[in-house]
């Protein structure tokens, strides 16, 4: 039984149920079997029924259970148990985005099998490198960030395209992305003996890295080289707790003035009128002004009738108490004038 790279708990990688000599990479639910890449391609290519079997990747953490979730931050396929254990370690890990893993098709599984074409391409690349790079062992001692490559002779565009086909198109290539220290999943990466060794040889070419030669290269090609270098040099990435406070916000906060401008009422666009439309509006306004009525309209006829018979004092409406007191005073004065004597006797 082959022992793969173990994680912190020291567990063994599950062996293939068919050959018992290689580590399993996929799990076939129809056969209830863990298979390596070679056995999976051989077994499921036997007939059409077997080629339609759905397979899922094996967990990259424990390598003993089928994967159920894909963590985008760590670029790792995890089973249910490992997903719950790893993403409950700290608050930063809980914010990782995970998506369910769909069963793999036969084409993607067959792409993992080694082919003679890849070996021939590797030999061609080595032969071309030997012709293009004279004396590749002169500047081996000059290192830059752990790897060296030539900017005068190395075709970065062609090399980056081959690295893209190796690390992006193949779904089963184990790689570790650099997310600024955001990875917390201990991955057990299987290094390919053909492509990774060749990439390390191409990196250690011994030519100083710099742009003083005047050559202009695509930025995407340089990013691909940095990405492939991190793949070959990093197997485990763990987030320290102290780095959580060092994370900088890439998107600045929106100011209050900008929010007020966005949330305010929409600006009204002034409508431009033609001379004919303006003249027509002026004529309509003048016609309405001529037919305007200024006389008062009587809304309540009963109130108007009561106001006409209501008693008034000096033009104003009088209350009943005032009218009664005035009537008594008039009646008493008339009575005294008729009798001829007053109330108070005079001496």
From Swiss-Prot:
CCT domain ranges (all copies): 278-320
Subcellular location: Nucleus
The keyword Chaperone is assigned to this record: no
Gene Ontology terms describing biological process: chloroplast organization; regulation of flower development
Zinc finger annotations (B box-type) as residue ranges: 16-58, 59-101
GO terms, molecular function: DNA binding; DNA-binding transcription factor activity; zinc ion binding
GO cellular component: nucleus
Entry binding sites for Zn(2+) 2: 59, 62, 82, 87
Pfam families: CCT (PF06203), zf-B_box (PF00643)
Induction and repression of expression: Expressed with a circadian rhythm showing a peak at dawn.
Summary of the tissues where the protein is detected: Highly expressed in leaves. Expressed at lower levels in stems, flowers and siliques. Not detected in roots.
Keywords: DNA-binding, Metal-binding, Nucleus, Repeat, Transcription, Transcription regulation, Zinc, Zinc-finger
InterPro entries listed in its UniProt record: CCT_domain (IPR010402), CONSTANS-like (IPR045281), CONSTANS-like_Bbox1 (IPR049808), Znf_B-box (IPR000315)
UniProt binding sites for Zn(2+) 1: 16, 19, 39, 44
Major site of localization recorded for this protein: nucleus
Function: Putative transcription factor. Does not affect flowering time.
Family according to the record: Belongs to the CONSTANS family.
Protein name, as recorded: Zinc finger protein CONSTANS-LIKE 2
Gene encoding the protein: COL2
């Amino acid at each position: 039984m082959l022992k793969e790279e173990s994680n912190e708990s020291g567990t063994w990688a599950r062996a293939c149920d068919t050959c018992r000599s290689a580590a399993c990479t996929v799990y076939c639910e129809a056969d209830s079997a863990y298979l390596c890449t070679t056995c999976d391609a051989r077994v499921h290519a036997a007939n059409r029924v077997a080629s339609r079997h759905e397979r899922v990747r094996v967990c990259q953490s424990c390598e003993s259970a089928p994967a159920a979730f894909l963590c985008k931050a760590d670029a790792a396929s995890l089973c249910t148990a490992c997903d719950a254990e790893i993403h409950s370690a700290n608050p930063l890990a809980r914010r990782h985005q995970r998506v369910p893993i769909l069963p793999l098709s036969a084409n993607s599984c067959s792409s993992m099998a080694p082919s003679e074409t890849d070996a021939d391409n590797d030999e061609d690349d080595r032969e071309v490198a030997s012709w293009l790079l004279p004396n590749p062992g002169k500047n081996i001692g000059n290192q830059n960030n752990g790897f060296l490559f030539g900017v005068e002779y190395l075709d970065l565009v062609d090399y980056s395209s081959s690295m893209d086909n190796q690390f992006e198109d193949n779904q089963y290539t184990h790689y570790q992305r650099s997310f600024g220290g955001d990875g917390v999943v201990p991955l057990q990466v299987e290094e390919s003996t053909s492509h990774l060794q060749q990439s390390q040889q191409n990196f250690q070419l011994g030519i100083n890295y710099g742009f003083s030669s005047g050559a202009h290269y695509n930025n995407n090609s340089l990013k691909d080289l940095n990405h492939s270098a991190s793949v070959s040099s990093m197997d485990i990435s763990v987030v320290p707790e102290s780095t959580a406070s060092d994370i900088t916000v890439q998107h600045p906060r929106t100011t209050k003035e900008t929010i007020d401008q966005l949330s305010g009422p929409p600006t009204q666009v002034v409508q431009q009128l033609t001379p004919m439309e303006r003249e027509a509006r002026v004529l309509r306004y003048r016609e309405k002004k001529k037919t305007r009525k200024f006389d008062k309209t009587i809304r309540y006829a009963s109130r108007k009738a009561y106001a006409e018979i209501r008693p008034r004092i000096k033009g104003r409406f009088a209350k009943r108490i005032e009218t009664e007191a005035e009537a008594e005073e008039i009646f008493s004065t008339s009575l005294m004038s008729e009798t001829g004597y007053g109330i108070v006797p005079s001496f």
